[in-house]
Each structure stands twice: as structure tokens, then as C-alpha cells.
Amino acid sequence: MAFEPKEPQKELKYNELRIYSDEELHNYTEEELKNFKIKHNVPMCDDLESGPWPSFVADAKREALHRRKLGKEKLMIERDVVEDLLGQLERSFEHGETHWKHGGIVGVFGYGGGVIGRYSDLQEEFPSIAHFHTMRVNQPASKFYNSDYLRTLCDLWEYRGSGMMNFHGSTGDIIFLGTFTEQLEPIFYELTHVLQQDLGGSGSNLRTPSCCIGKARCEWACYDTQDMCYEMTYHYQDELHRPAFPYKFKFKFDGCPNCCVASIARADMSFIGTWRDNIRIDQKAVQAYIGGEIIPNAGAHRGRDWGKFDIDKEVIDLCPTKCMWMEGGKLMIDDKECTRCMHCINVMPQALWPGKETGVSILVGAKAPILEGAQMSLLTIPFMKAEYPYDNIKNNVIEPIWEWWMEEGKNRERLGELIQRQGIQKLIQILNIPAMPQMVKEPRSNPYIFWKSEDVPGGFKRDIKDYRSRHKR
């Protein structure tokens, strides 16, 4: 089925929207850059330009020179913003502490997220960054861009912001680094009305959903990651723009177990493509790999001579559940023991494919260290069909978990920490699902078993008021 956007789309033409001419965009020479000095003395920042790696300081100096030559009449905030930024960074290196402070909540009308307020506590020394707010822009699914869009975006931020951007933040957003409060509403208007792009999430809300390239270009995608990401973004607009959660919540959509957006490590709820039937095998292609007729790993490791392909060492022995073996010249797989790691498929992509009955595995609880340590996602739903409009997932998984988390979660407590605190048993109860071996971390050490009346033949009744009338505290 062809993709149908929820809103009418228009084609952007940079030449109709551009703010700067080609001469203004390319307004300095490499010789000028070599001789350029910013207005602050920043020896430690300068030192970061040395060495073999690309330097953000070198990039910042290019932008500083570009803005200085553009002049104030072509910019809506101070032209020295990047120079002052490097100056304050040098002070932070000298003092061993940050010089950004929180001075209150800033944002755009109607939204509780999308803007991260940032103010300098050295405003007299660095007035151009007295305000230096960050804006998060909701990226297109799978980060597909064309040149007209990117150039228009860059012109807008050059004109109304610092000109510095980050492609992309760890959640996936386009990051606009540094502008003044007065520019937030005009930028938001241009983004939404001209570029048809929304702000992303920030604060204690649903963060911008992010997905891999999916069926657009990847043969292994087991569901349409872009469609699901788009639908969840639209369906949960209120949760994305108006913070109501105990803390942040992230969706990430991986089309297959290769996990190209690392959802298993970075998302409160990970959707990883999988299959529930058997891996498909082309035995002739298996023999072609063994005989050296087909290069393993699709040629990805051709940088050196690894010797003749050995299916035992490179595939069978590396299977985490040891569910593969050769028998009579054929590759055999015990699919009920397969853990869907994709290793064998990655090594022999012309011989093995995922099954035909595809869907998603849903995992919950990954996070970085906040209240507790970092942790990976917990497999919660081994298989679920993922088909538009995804009501089975919304109604049976997402919303029951949110209801529990918003009721029971402490301030700044991620979902994974709530599960740590209240136990996996509570999660199982909320979702009304059976326990699985994957949920067992270690043998139990608590000698007591707490039975529910429905678990005991004949049941039992317990009147706590009657008990307390006879046994005072």
C-alpha cells in the first residue's frame, strides 16, 4: 500500500525560499580562514584543533568568520555569538565547571517541550550568548532529506540563530544550537508553516520517535518502520508536546534484530522486527558459500585476506543457542531454539532470509544512568503483528504501561527503574501476559511465596479490617 501522509505535502524550492545569495554563503577564502583570530584568547580550545581528528572548534571558527563577514544587517541575533561561545567554553575549561545556568522555562506557545532554555552566567563578559536556547526539530522518518530542505533549514538558522546545528541528537532530532528568546516564535512559525516540520520532544514527555531506514532500502526489514514511526508520532502528539510523564519516554523502531538505531540500548520501548516461522534456507547458495563462489558478509570484510570461508567457525560455532548444524551436506536449523540474532543471515545473506510471518518483538526499560545504572531493554512481548493502525500495540501495550508508570513512577524515574523497583511481576500483571524464561535474572532468594486467592485451589478470603480488630498494630 502506498504511503499516504496525514497532511497535504508541498514541494520546497530553495531558490524561492532562500535568504542568502551564493556570494554571501561563500564569503571567505581559505587564506582568510588561516589568518582569522576570534576576539577572545582561547588557547585550550585552539589545542583541540590539533591531532588527526575533525574538530568542532575548527568548524565553529569557520562559522564565526562567516558571520563576521555577513555583518549585523544580515543576522537577527548578534554576529559574535560563536566567538562568545568559544570564549565561554575556554572559561569552563579554566574553571572546571559549566557556565550555563537555568533561568526559567522558555518555549513556544502551546508547547511544553521542544526548546531547552539555556542562559550564560557570564553575560557581561559574553553578551552575545546571554541567551543560548537549543531547539529540537522533529526529523523525517529514517532521516531522508533533499538539498532544498537542508539549505532552507540552514538559511533559517543562520538568520535567526547561531548558525550551528547538530545532525543529529542522540534521540534523532535535528538540533538548533543557540538563539535568543525573541527568535523562538518566528523560528517555530517558519518551521511549521513553510518547512512543514514540527518541533521534537524535550522534558518529561514522549521524545521524538526514531526509526531505521526500514523497507525503504533494507531487505531485512520485518515491518514498515517508517509507517509505524510516523503513525506513533501523529497519534501521540499530545504526549510529545505537553509533558505529563514522570520523566522522558522514548520509542525506537528497528526493522530487524540488527538493531540499526540501537533501540535495545536506548529506548524505553523498543520495537524490533522479527519473525515467528522458520528461517528460509537456499541449500544451493549455502554450498556456494562453502565452495567460495559467493563472498561471505556480502563482501563487507574484503579489506584483507581472511582465508577460505569456514561455515563451522564463522556461522555454526558462533550461533548463541547452538541451533545450527550440517547434516548430509545441508545446513539444518532447529528454529524453536533460534534466538533471532541475525548473525547467520548477515554472514550468508544470499542463502538465508527471515521467515515470512513477520512482526515485532517489544522490549521495555532501556536507559542511561539516571537514578540507577544503565540497563538494556527487557524482552516483554516476543511477537506481535505490526500493521496499520497498530491499535493492538497502542491499546494492549503502550497505554497500559503509560497508565501504570504515570500513576506509580517517581519524579525523574524512567520506566526501567520503575520495573526495577516494583518488579517484573507487576509489569506482567499490568500487561496480562505470561512470564518467560528471558525475564529471569537469577534464581529467587526470597523463601516466601505470596499467593493470590485465584492461584490457590478453592481460594481464600482475607478481611484485613477483621484481622486488625483482633490484632492491633
PLM feature spans:
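Charge-rich, low-complexity segments
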Residues: A2-D121
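Small-residue-enriched alpha-helical segments and adjacent helix-cap loops
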Residues: A2-D22, Y28, G103-Y111, H133-G299, ...
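Short glycine-/aliphatic-rich beta-strand segments at the starts of folded cytosolic domains
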Residues: L85-Y145, T208-A216, L379-F383
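Flexible, glycine/charged-enriched surface loops at secondary-structure junctions
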Residues: H102, S162-G169, G201-G203, R242-K248, ...
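A glycine-rich phosphate-binding loop feature that marks nucleotide/adenosyl-phosphate handling sites
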Residues: P209-C212, F249-N258, L415-I428, Y448
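Iron-sulfur cluster-binding cysteine motifs and their immediate structural context
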Residues: D268, I311-I333, E337-S361
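A hydrophobic, small-residue-rich beta->alpha segment in the mid-to-C-terminal subdomain
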Residues: V360, A366-G409
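C-terminal, charged low-complexity interaction regions
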Residues: K426-R473
